[in-house]
């Protein structure tokens, strides 16, 4: 039995902190809280009306996938991870993650609601898990892992792949629109959400490092390569990024690059050994630790939650 899954009678009380690294990650998440009301999407409609039919088609399908996927992540947290993991610090993080995923889902739903005026098309997009085969394939893969009998460690990797790999190409495609100066509301929300998801992915890697009996490298590689092939198909066959003027082969390479970064963070050898083909993604917050706190991505951070001078905080307070 993994110590972090062992029954813990002290799980209802936060102090004293036992796992400082996990608690620090929770405080990082707390510091980066935001709400949809802070994102101005009023200027997006002008840009939306100038987009080509292909560009609109692409964005609508990406948003449809995103709108459903956060709910799947939350179902896994509610039904499995929050129940299985017994250490309070991780439960704090998972609880906060659920709130953030709700905000992401609300944001994507609001974007669809704003851009798409036809009510039938709206319903089609909101029900993408049933109506769109390309979205259904990704959703089915993620949902399969919620109910799988695999170990916590294996399912941890699967959901790190969902948040780290299944989202990566879509994030990059929206940042591509930012590079072109389009859709400021969509691209700003994408910046906030990609930063959050990067942090969630980093948290999965941290939890993995706390496992005494982690899955084998072979198992990890199998889960990650499976996710890579599904994501590559999504963005180069089902919903090709060439619709918005991106290069499909470069997108395939980018997804491999992201997968390598994830598996390295888990402590294993890279699978693909490729370089990042998208220069505009070099400084983007897809790694949760990519210095949101140093760069203050989107110039937003919850005031006073973490010191601006440094991110280290101590609990050695004299009570």
UniProtKB/Swiss-Prot annotation:
Family matches, as CDD domains: RNRR2
Family matches, as PROSITE patterns: RIBORED_SMALL
Catalytic activity, reaction form: a 2'-deoxyribonucleoside 5'-diphosphate + [thioredoxin]-disulfide + H2O = a ribonucleoside 5'-diphosphate + [thioredoxin]-dithiol
Keyword flag Transcription: no
InterPro entries in UniProt: Ferritin-like_SF, RNR-like, RNR_small, RNR_small_AS, RNR_small_fam
Pfam (any one): Ribonuc_red_sm
Domain of life: Viruses
Signal sequence extent: none
Annotated residues for binding of Fe cation 1: 70, 101, 104
One GO term (biological process): deoxyribonucleotide biosynthetic process
Enzyme kind, highest EC tier: oxidoreductase
Catalytic site: 108
Region called Interaction with R1, residue ranges: 313-319
Molecular function GO labels: metal ion binding; ribonucleoside-diphosphate reductase activity, thioredoxin disulfide as acceptor
Keyword Metal-binding: yes
Cofactor(s) of this protein: Fe cation
Role noted for this protein: Ribonucleoside-diphosphate reductase holoenzyme provides the precursors necessary for viral DNA synthesis. Allows virus growth in non-dividing cells. Catalyzes the biosynthesis of deoxyribonucleotides from the corresponding ribonucleotides.
Family of the protein in this entry: Belongs to the ribonucleoside diphosphate reductase small chain family.
Assembly, per entry: Interacts with RNR1/OPG080 subunit. Can interact with host RNR1 supunit.
Entry protein name: Ribonucleoside-diphosphate reductase small chain
Species the sequence originates in: Variola virus
